[in-house]
Curated annotation (Swiss-Prot):
Enzyme class: hydrolase
Protein name listed in UniProt: Putative phospholipase B-like lamina ancestor
Pfam families listed in its UniProt record: Phospholip_B (PF04916)
Biological processes annotated in GO: dorsal appendage formation; imaginal disc development; phospholipid catabolic process
Subcellular location: Secreted
InterPro entries the UniProt entry points to: PLipase_B-like (IPR007000)
EC number: 3.1.1.-
Function: Putative phospholipase. Involved in the regulation of cellular plasticity in imaginal disks.
Tissue: Expressed in neural and glial progenitors prior to, but not after, differentiation. Not expressed in late third instar disks, but is expressed uniformly by early third instar disks, in the imaginal ring of the proventriculus and in the salivary gland.
Family recorded in the similarity comment: Belongs to the phospholipase B-like family.
Domain of life the protein comes from: Eukaryota
GO CC list: extracellular region
């Protein structure tokens, strides 16, 4: 009897414990439910690991807030896609100097490909895939282009491996290695996400995406030389005129401001607006912090340009806009470029495209190995075949406050006082200041097969002439004459423009006012092409502070409390607005083809955009932001997968973690 009672008590005690435990679990769950959970902003991070025995591995950390403490490994990456929020994605990649350069490069490519694979696919589908399948002629051109770039890739790979002790060629080798890693990472990312993509991206199309800046030049060569010599060429006699392709180009504005009271204090104002197909508007702000060396030997010095930030596109390892800021030990500089106009197609006879080096690879190599702006221009002058542009590069470290003696001399000259008597020490100090300013600003201009470069610092310090508007018209006289382009004062800044350009806000207004929107040309002429972004940069030498922000999407003006005007009202003005007068009269666009340019700008014929239509388009920039839903399928041309419908975004200033 006692045994039965004891057993029953034991069961009761166990049951009580179970009930208490269950109650505690309920209470704990209640409190956990009300605890503050970590909120993430959509930033995904990963680390690349490498050993000789195992090879490469990627550790994905999913969403993270504590970016600083992401494990370094060979390299690490953080990526946030905010295209629907502000028009930009953002990516930051860092590698470690203790690993061989080729390991750093391949790991960086793998990391980027694995996290951005979806945007890479969308960009390829919107641009290359849709453009190359448009008709028979573009299919043939794309086939020729893929064969050329693949052959060129194998040639470059062999040559860079042989010339590993050449600083420039070593960087080209690393670019190729990073691109190979990008393809591997793309495949791994898509496989890891178990994505069922409609098409595979061949490696030749990764090459093609990274040759985006060269394609317009290659198209000119193809139409005028490759196609003309082809046995399949059946064009009627008398119609084989040279084919050139002009589009509303990117615009770049550079101004160095000197304070009236302290002319020795310099400030840089810089604006850049890219021209391109609306289909290519999947944008990424990138930062590459790669600790490469001058050669493949780990004991060689680290390159000056370790830290490079730029605005770019998915799947492309450089800007192609082009705008870069470069930092490193004793280095802080910017680089900007726009396409250059060329009427002299005879220059292409001296160029062999099989020996080309893609522009984006050349620029990234120059950015990394150049300690100053002269060496940057010299590096860019190697292999100037395709990707013809005009460039400006500014050394921000040279924009420092002048010494006190120089200030006194400037003040005496200003007030017509008696000059200060100089001794040898004073003269030396002044000469050192002039030497300091030397090589602060360089301009380089490339036509097929040649490049002209020069230190133009003094030209930017002359009162009343401190700005340069780069819109494709050559800066140097010899380049202008060789290009056959007609110079026009209407394409340059006026005195009134110079006086108004005193801040980033005024640079912003100028570039928007003189922007081009092909979707506003009218119902019969609309094309999905124009100025698709705006980047603004300033540097205050006194404070040593820079400011950068970017806008995504076709440019438009934000008017407040303004009654919209009708076209009838505009017609009563009896004149062309100032904005239209700044239009380049030589620009021409093939409407039938330009609507499908995508990233590749595959144009096959010419037809001018009438001046009156351009004037209307430029006026209507104030009508509001671009919307895909307001364009017909014919006008759209390429695709727009992954794009927001309305491109109405405010400025974005990236914040970097490392």
């Amino acid at each position: 009897m006692l045994k039965v009672v004891g057993a029953s008590w034991q069961k009761t005690r166990i049951g009580t414990y179970i009930l208490i435990g269950a109650g505690l679990l309920v209470i704990g769950a209640f409190f956990i439910g009300y605890m503050e959970r970590p909120e993430y902003d959509g930033t995904y991070c990963a680390t690349a690991l490498w050993t000789k025995q195992v090879g490469f591995q990627i550790e994905n950390w999913k969403q993270q807030n504590d970016l600083v403490n992401i494990p370094t490994g060979v390299g690490r990456i953080c990526y946030k896609d905010s295209v629907y929020e502000n028009g930009w994605a953002q990516i930051e990649v860092e590698t470690q100097r203790t690993y061989p350069d080729w390991v750093q490069a391949y790991a960086a490519g793998m990391l980027e490909g694995s996290l951005t694979w979806r945007n890479i696919y969308n960009q390829w589908s919107n641009t290359i895939s849709s453009s190359c399948e448009r008709d028979e002629s573009t299919q043939k051109f794309c086939g020729w282009l893929r064969d050329l770039l693949t052959t060129n890739y194998h040639r470059l790979k062999r040559q860079t491996e042989k010339a590993e002790n050449d600083h420039y060629w070593h960087q080209l080798h690393l670019f190729i290695t990073q691109l190979e890693g990008l393809e591997t990472g793309y495949k791994r990312g898509a496989s890891r996400a178990r994505s069922d993509l409609e098409e595979e991206i061949p490696f030749s199309d990764f090459l093609l995406m990274n040759a985006a800046a060269d394609i317009q030049d290659l198209k000119i060569y193809y139409e005028n030389y490759e196609l003309q010599n082809s046995t399949e060429h059946t064009e009627e006699p008398g119609t084989d005129q040279p084919k050139n392709f002009f589009l509303p180009s990117a615009t770049m504005l550079t101004k160095i401001v000197q304070e009236e009271e302290s002319p020795q204090v310099l400030q840089l104002l810089f604006g850049h607006s890219t021209a391109g197909s609306y289909s290519s508007m999947l944008r990424i702000q990138k930062r590459y912090k790669f600790h490469y060396h001058f050669s493949s030997k780990l004991r060689s010095n680290t390159v000056p340009g370790v830290d490079i930030t730029f605005t770019g596109y998915p799947g492309i390892l450089g800007s192609t806009d082009d705008f870069y800021t470069i930092k490193g030990r004793h280095l802080h500089a910017i680089v900007g470029g726009v396409g250059i106009k060329n009427e002299n197609l005879q220059l292409w006879k001296t160029v062999d495209p099989k020996k080309m080096v893609p522009l984006v690879a050349r620029v990234m190599a120059a950015n990394r190995i150049s300690q100053n702006r002269q060496t940057w221009a010299s590096a860019m002058s190697r292999h100037p075949f395709t990707g013809a542009k005009q460039w400006i590069t500014v050394d921000l470290n040279k924009m420092k406050v002048q010494d006190n003696l120089y200030n006194v001399l400037e003040g005496d000259d200003k007030h017509d006082d008696a000059p200060v008597v100089l001794n040898e020490k004073d003269r030396t100090a002044i000469q050192q200041r002039h030497d300091q300013l030397r090589d602060m600003v360089w301009i380089a201009e490339q036509l097929p097969g040649m490049m002209t470069k020069k230190d133009v610092t003094q030209g930017f310090l002359v009162p009343g002439n401190t700005s340069w508007l780069a819109n494709g018209v050559p800066y140097f006289k010899n380049v202008l004459e060789l290009s056959g382009v007609n110079y026009s004062e209407d394409q340059q800044l006026t005195v009134a423009d110079e006086e108004e350009l005193t801040s980033l806000a005024s640079v912003d207004k100028y570039l928007r006012t003189h922007g081009f929107r092909g979707d506003l040309l009218g119902s019969q002429e609309s094309i999905a092409y124009g100025n698709i972004d705006l980047k603004l940069f300033s540097y205050n030498a006194r404070l040593g502070i820079s400011d950068f922000h970017a806008f995504a999407g076709p440019v438009f003006l934000r008017f407040q409390h303004t009654q919209p005007r009708t076209l009838e009202d505009e017609g009563q003005d009896g004149g062309v607005p100032p904005a239209a007068s700044m239009g380049d009269e030589r620009l021409s666009v093939s409407i039938e083809d330009a609507d499908s340019l995508a990233e590749m700008e595959l144009i096959t014929e010419r037809r001018s955009v009438r001046n009156d239509m351009r004037a209307i388009a430029m006026r209507k920039i104030g009508s509001g932001p671009f919307k895909w839903s307001e364009m017909s399928p014919v006008e759209e041309g390429g695709g727009h997968e992954g794009h927001p419908d309305e491109w109405n975004f405010d400025k974005v200033s990236p914040k970097w973690a490392w």
